[in-house]
Swiss-Prot record:
Its cofactor is a divalent metal cation. Binds 1 divalent metal cation per subunit. Pathway: Isoprenoid biosynthesis; isopentenyl diphosphate biosynthesis via DXP pathway; isopentenyl diphosphate from 1-deoxy-D-xylulose 5-phosphate: step 4/6. It catalyses: 4-CDP-2-C-methyl-D-erythritol 2-phosphate = 2-C-methyl-D-erythritol 2,4-cyclic diphosphate + CMP. This is 2-C-methyl-D-erythritol 2,4-cyclodiphosphate synthase. Homotrimer. The lineage of its organism: Bacteria, Pseudomonadati, Pseudomonadota, Gammaproteobacteria, Alteromonadales.
Length: 170
C-alpha cells in the first residue's frame, strides 16, 4: 500500500468554463491556467504520482509544452491512471477536499465523484469529494481562487502486468 497527498490552487480570471472534478460548474469566472485549470484533478494527479514516487504533474505535463494548452485535465488523469496500473497499483480510495468560498459546490459533488470514478476506473464508493470554505479568510475567502487537497491510498495489484521495459529485457 502507498499513500499520496496532492495540492493545487488556481486563481480566478477570464471567462469560464469553470471545471472542477471534470464537471463544468456555472460561474462567472474561469481559472487562469495553462490547461483547463481543473484544480481537483490536478491535486488528484499529484496525489497519485506522489504515491508512486513519480514526481508531480508539472514534470509529466509541463506548462511550457504547447500540447497541454487548454487540454482537458481528464486526459491527464487518464494518463496518470495508466502509469499507476503500469506500476502495479490500483486505487484503494481517494479523498478530495475543495476549498472555495464560491461557487457553491454541494450541487455538483455527486457528479464530480461519478466523473472521477470513471477516469480512475473504480467505483463511486472509492472516491469522495467534499467542499469547505475558509470562513472568508485568505485568497479563497476573498473569492480570488480555489484550492484543493487530495489524498489517495493505492493498493498493489496481486499479479501486475509486466512493464514494457521488463518484457524487452526477457
Amino acid at each position: 500500500m502507498r499513500i499520496g497527498h496532492g495540492f493545487d490552487v488556481h486563481k480566478f480570471g477570464g471567462k469560464g468554463p469553470l471545471v472542477l472534478g471534470g464537471v463544468k460548474i456555472p460561474f462567472e469566472l474561469g481559472f487562469i491556467a495553462h490547461s483547463d485549470g481543473d484544480v481537483a484533478i490536478h491535486a488528484l494527479c499529484d496525489a497519485i504520482l506522489g504515491a508512486l514516487c513519480l514526481a508531480d504533474i508539472g514534470n509529466h505535463f509541463p506548462d511550457t509544452d504547447g500540447q497541454y494548452e487548454n487540454i482537458s485535465s481528464r486526459i491527464l488523469l487518464r494518463h496518470v491512471v495508466s502509469l499507476m496500473t503500469d506500476k502495479g497499483f490500483q486505487l484503494g480510495n481517494a479523498d478530495i477536499t475543495i476549498v472555495a468560498q464560491a461557487p457553491k459546490m454541494a450541487p455538483h459533488l455527486v457528479a464530480m465523484r461519478t466523473c472521477l470514478s470513471e477516469d480512475l476506473k473504480t467505483t463511486i464508493e472509492q472516491v469522495n469529494v467534499k467542499a469547505t470554505t475558509t470562513e472568508k479568510l485568505g485568497y479563497t475567502g476573498r473569492k480570488e481562487g480555489i484550492s484543493v487537497h487530495a489524498v489517495v491510498l493505492l493498493i498493489a495489484i496481486e499479479h501486475p502486468l509486466p512493464l514494457i521495459e521488463e518484457i524487452q529485457n526477457i
